[in-house]
Amino acid sequence: MRTAGRLAVACWLALACAAGAPARGADLSELKVLYVGSERKSDYVEFLEGQVARVEARSRKAFRPEEARDFDVVLLDWPQGEETREMRTLRSPLGARADWGRPTVLLGSAGLNLAVCWKLKGGSGCTCLDPLAYDLRDHEIFERPHRIDRGRMIAIPTPKDFRDELEEPEIRVLPLVDDRETRRMPGWCTHALDFARYPDVEFFCGGVNSQTPTSAALWRQGNLLHFGFQESPSEMNENGRRLLLNAIAYISRFTEDRPIAVTPSVFAGPVARSRSTPARWLRHGELRIDSIKDVVSPETWAEIEGAGDREAMARRADELARFLHPNAEQILEVDPDLVALGVAFDDPAFFDRTLADLRSSDPAVAGRAGRLLRRYAPEGPGGADADAWTRWRDENRPYLFASDAGDYRWYVDPLAKRRGVPSAELRGPGRADR
């Protein structure tokens, strides 16, 4: 009787755990995973059975966000196709960005589609990713729970589209499939030149693609992990399947972090380029002048063009870059208020200068400072006086960072502020649950 009683209690506890709240920071075998999609439901469910504690699937079109409540990780499978053709009108199957807190792996083009809907990083790149991982960083995602065998990396000729930036005749890549010569649906890779400035973003690896060697294939923003490779588990080799499992395990630990920056996508409408774009494009010999001319205002272009040859123009564009700002048409132009201030909006001295000017007895100087603060620090106290702005700056100084990816503004890092850790020090795995 006692044995039967103990067995009954054990069974009850097992059922309670299976039906209860998500297991934060759990091992892979303890995780409850929900696949949201339609196209590859059987493949993912069959693969994950036996790997995780529980796996279920929901149709993407019928999915309700509250259905994810009892799961540790959601896999969103949302390919490009007829459903996503009108990207300006896309609606997220996960609901509103502000309401979604579940750790999520974005499979293939789900990273693009959700980025367009939610204005995330990931909305600029190309559907051109091959199943060849490149530039693997020294990161735990390649070690736990399964060690990725870097000894299986191979050398291939440097892709044509990488040669402008890489001088080496060969690069080393990790194949995620065995038959790498077979043509497949390409995955989604994201332009990643500015990733290092964002506290909530970490880059794990790139992949062979038809744009740049710096593009990201596997990376994280907040509680969202982008697994850009399009291949299903049944198409992958052992390293590919292990990498997918490691991605699920890693993102399960990020229930507190969230994407911070609001980054509009070029696929949803006009977006201002970053300030470095004109100079960078001028130094790219194959880009036509007209393409570069189109991203800046006529007045700004006249100043750049007057510098002389292409390299001289690039140098002048570099000089102007710190004062560039998008106008209402999302074209870059010189901000006269920044020129008068004498520093870029993302310069650490920006707040010291503007706050000093806000106390000026000259109405023109104080008015300019107020405009700059409202324009570049929209989370601040708006039209408040210098004392209120100074208190806000002092309260948030350790947690501030700036972005010019279409947004051109300062942000407060909410996780860093909540934990009382400077944003510059709270990066990568340090943002996982404690």
Mark where each language-model region is.
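Helical hinge/lid and interdomain linker segments adjacent to catalytic or ligand-binding clefts
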Residues: 30-116
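Boundary at the C-terminal end of the N-terminal hydrophobic targeting segment
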Residues: 20-25
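Extracellular ligand-binding/catalytic regions of CAZymes and related secreted enzymes
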Residues: 26-29, 197-329, 406
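Long, helix-rich interaction regions
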Residues: 129-137, 145, 289-434
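Positively charged n-region of N-terminal signal peptides that target proteins for export
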Residues: 1-6
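Bacterial N-terminal signal peptides
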Residues: 8-18
